[in-house]
Regions:
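C-terminal, non-catalytic "cap/extension" segments appended to globular domains
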Residues: 2-23, 29, 33, 215-217, ...
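Short, hydrophobic/aliphatic alpha-helical segments
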Residues: 257-268, 439-445, 483, 648-650
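Short His/Asp/Glu-rich catalytic/ion-coordination signatures at enzyme active sites or charged loops
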Residues: 11-26, 75-94, 118-159, 219-258, ...
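Short, hydrophobic/amphipathic alpha-helical patches that form generic packing surfaces
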Residues: 67-77, 136, 140, 336-343, ...
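Intrinsically disordered or highly flexible coil/loop and linker segments, enriched in small
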Residues: 36, 40, 44-51, 67-84, ...
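Active-site-proximal, well-structured secondary-structure segments within enzyme catalytic domains
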Residues: 129-130, 134-135, 163-166, 173, ...
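Short pre-active-site segment immediately N-terminal to the catalytic Zn-binding motif
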Residues: 450-468
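N-terminal helix-rich structural modules
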Residues: 1-195, 627
């Protein structure tokens, strides 16, 4: 009998896992044993002679796969944040194993008959609101995943799901390996003219760590790539970096083009097998947007304002570049560089001026102080919690009255084995165990921030501070839920609602009241100067049209892939992509491919859902207006958001939750108003 105790240790706070006692080589065996245990328990539920009730069916089923959930949550946490080649190989085996198990349960006619019986009698069962939502979610989970199909179609669905379970981790791994394979080695410091000293120091230390003597090493990790593209005067070097970044997993040994064609084809087949015309139709049925027509109309509305603003932004940058010695047509590797120079000229502001005021620890403390002031929750470092890497810090999260809310694991810097980007993960949702005890959430926030150097602490860019607040907002959604059922607690909400708490948090970062809480010079302790905040605020809508237009184009690309009703015509990924975004191409096409590294939609759960970021931006812009109207830290407004949005998870439809908070629907113009894109 396998001992699963390391995944939930009795002697640790909140039964946290002990990563030090979990051996990489045991995952496969542990998952097989956990699946066997779960199967036996599901058989007991299935073969019960008792009339179905919520307790003996829904609750009983929720408790069948406890060990499997524990092992998988740890495995997938590490697969993203602390992976190895062996784990990537395991993922190719684990995906089909868990897919087969899920389908064995989801397609079992006897199990579904019990769920269906409860659904038919739902109004006579005396269920409370939460139980009704859980029953509905369970019934839809079965029906939307093939429970009503005939045997032959069920077999076909199994084949599709097995293949998809292999392809998504393969796509993600290819993107990671392709990015990691690139290095730009510079041996002449004169070639780095324009680059800030802190970026050069970091590149020097990276080179030393990689045994490149007397050199500077630049990679495609964001803390290296973005400063390089923003400040390096050498246009040829910028071009090299841009071409590498824009060609991740494209026409190299980690190429993702075949994976994309397979994923898209299988998603179409799956949707049509389940009675939908397209994958987007299938996905959007369970979203606030409801259908593609609504998404299309939403994007068209944004496009109407973003397009002319983007053209204006491009014209302004082009004129400025020509005025200052640039000759010719701007290329993609020129935009960030010249836009930064134009911002400096127009606002006398360089975001690098902010960096000394954003040492990482102060920013962490600031995010925590912000949450305490806004929502009445306190985060405190806690010792003795085993972590999966020395970079990871743990915090206990409590209400001000001492009520425990959960544990937060924070992991901030790039390293080999960690994928790019930033994300919030869940090691355990808030839930109720088989003994009826509430289990509190274990949540992680994982990022790839600028590293400390030998001489300075990690000093963040403003974008990185926004990312910290964003991911912490997701974490608060998980930690502050009051729902004791994992299926509807925390971030278990519609995908186009889940970004509201995270994006809302970013709004405070241009407010003096918030910045003065934590933005202090790492050497002198001086609070960030008022003049610098004013410059930040004055420049916050700089290039907003360009940025929004870019986001709309990515949404259109996502929808182009997922509104197909046949994959027969997709012979060439890049040709399909070019056609899909041709109307959004304002700069000359210079090669590369977005789709091959677009992990959000091919490996990250945002297929037919990338629009969710913009959809939620309308919500967060409107929600923040409630705080500007009532006071940035108005206790009543903060508590109302906590109790109507964060606490309730997916226990009610998101539109209902938002109306309860705001007293009305979100104003569709709120995003354009905030970004300065509404016509006067």
């Amino acid at each position: 009998m396998t001992d699963f105790s390391a995944y939930a240790v009795d002697g640790l706070p909140l039964n946290a896992p002990d990563f030090s006692k979990i051996n990489e080589g045991d995952y496969i065996a542990h998952i097989k044993e956990a699946i066997a245990l779960a199967r036996a328990r599901f058989e007991n539920v299935k073969n019960s002679n008792e009339k179905p009730t919520f307790a003996n069916t829904i609750t009983a089923m929720d408790n069948c796969d406890t060990e499997l959930d524990q092992v998988l949550s740890v495995f997938y946490t590490l697969l993203s944040a602390e992976s190895t080649d062996a784990m990537q190989d395991m993922a190719q085996e684990i995906g089909p194993m868990t897919s087969e198990f899920s389908n064995d349960i989801g397609l079992d006619p006897t199990i579904f008959a019990r769920i269906d019986d409860l659904w038919t009698r739902r109004d006579d069962l005396g269920l409370n609101n939460n139980e009704m939502m859980i029953l509905e979610k369970s019934w839809l989970g079965f029906t939307r995943n093939g429970a009503k199909l005939g045997d032959a179609d069920k077999d076909k669905l199994r084949e599709i799901d097995t293949e998809l379970s292999k392809l998504s981790p393969q796509f993600s791994d290819n993107a990671r390996l392709s990015a990691n394979a690139f290095e730009l080695i510079v041996t002449n410091e004169d070639d780095l003219s324009g680059l800030p000293e802190n970026a050069k120091t970091a590149a020097r230390e990276t080179a030393e760590a990689k045994d490149h003597k007397n050199a500077w090493c630049f990679t495609l990790e964001y803390p290296s790539y973005i400063p390089f593209m923003t400040y390096t005067d050498d246009r040829n070097l910028r071009e090299q970096m841009w071409r590498a970044f824009s060609s991740r997993a494209f026409n190299d040994k980690h190429d993702n083009q075949d994976a994309i064609k397979q994923i898209v084809s299988l998603r179409i087949q799956r949707a049509q097998l389940l009675g939908y015309d397209t994958h987007a139709d299938y996905v959007l049925e369970r979203r606030m947007a409801e259908n593609f027509d609504n998404v299309d109309a939403f994007l068209t509305t944004l496009d109407t304002s973003a397009r002319p603003a983007a053209v204006k932004d491009l014209n302004n940058i082009t004129a400025y570049a020509h005025k200052n010695g640039f000759d010719g047509v701007l290329k993609p590797w020129d935009m960030t560089y010249w836009s930064e120079k134009l911002k400096k000229a127009e606002y006398d502001f360089d975001e690098e001026e902010l960096r000394p005021y954003f040492p990482l620890q102060a920013c962490i403390d600031g995010a925590f102080a912000h949450a305490e002031k806004l929502f009445g929750v306190r985060c405190t470092p806690i010792d003795g919690i085993p972590t999966y890497h020395g970079d990871v810090t743990t915090y206990e999260v409590k209400d001000l009255d001492g009520t425990m809310r959960g544990l937060l694991y924070a992991d901030f810097h790039p390293r080999a084995g960690k994928r790019q980007g930033a994300w919030q993960g869940t090691i355990r949702d808030r839930d109720t165990n088989e003994n009826g005890d509430v289990e509190l959430p274990l949540v992680s926030i994982v990022m790839n921030f600028t590293k400390p150097t030998k001489d300075t602490p990690a000093l963040l860019t403003f974008d990185e501070v926004e990312t910290l607040f964003h991911e912490f907002g997701h974490a608060l959604h998980s930690l502050l839920t009051d729902i004791n059922h994992g299926a509807i607690s925390g971030t278990s909400v519609f995908w186009d609602f889940v970004e509201l708490p995270s994006q809302l948090m970013e709004n405070w970062l241009t407010e003096p009241e918030t910045l003065n809480m934590f933005a202090k010079h790492y050497e002198t302790g001086e609070t960030i100067p008022t003049q610098l905040i004013e410059k930040l605020r004055a420049s916050r809508n700089f290039m907003k049209g360009w940025q929004l237009f870019r986001q709309v184009s990515l949404c259109r690309l996502d929808m182009a892939w997922h509104t197909l009703d046949s994959a027969d015509g997709i012979d060439d990924v890049i040709n399909f992509e070019r056609e899909a975004v041709d109307d959004y191409t304002l700069l000359p096409y210079e090669g590369g491919c977005t789709s091959t590294s677009f992990s959000h939609i091919f490996a990250g759960g945002y297929s037919a859902g990338y629009y969710s970021y913009l959809w939620a931006q309308v919500l967060d812009a409107d929600a923040f207006e409630a705080f500007t109207e009532n006071g940035l830290y108005d206790p009543e407004t903060g508590q109302k958001f906590r109790h109507e949005i964060l606490a309730k998870g997916g226990s009610r439809p998101p539109l209902e939750l938002y109306r309860n908070f705001r007293g009305r629907d979100a104003d569709p113009d709120s995003l354009l108003r905030r970004d300065g894109l509404l016509d006067d």
